[in-house]
């Protein structure tokens, strides 16, 4: 009633996360993280088809499979499918850049590089 939304972000596979959500109050949402998904080897389409209607927040980053965050476009995140899912589910929530840091002192340059990377894929 006070305008606060609660979202869960986990490393559970889609079916286990779906089970968790089914056992939570219906107003609990999902914070989706593209990098964590890539790191765990999950299928973006399967995740969104499983609980996309409950996604209220999206963290955007790139990660290697079973590895760390890397600059956008250098990891295993499936941004093309993510763009399709954002459109399919008419997502209108936050897109939060949680990207790997570039060279110190060049934050503005890195911001524009990351933003353009996403815009080129229809995200944002």
Residue ranges and their predicted role:
Residues 14-32, 36-124:
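Histidine-acidic metal/acid-base catalytic patches
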Residues 5-12:
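Catalytic beta/alpha-barrel core
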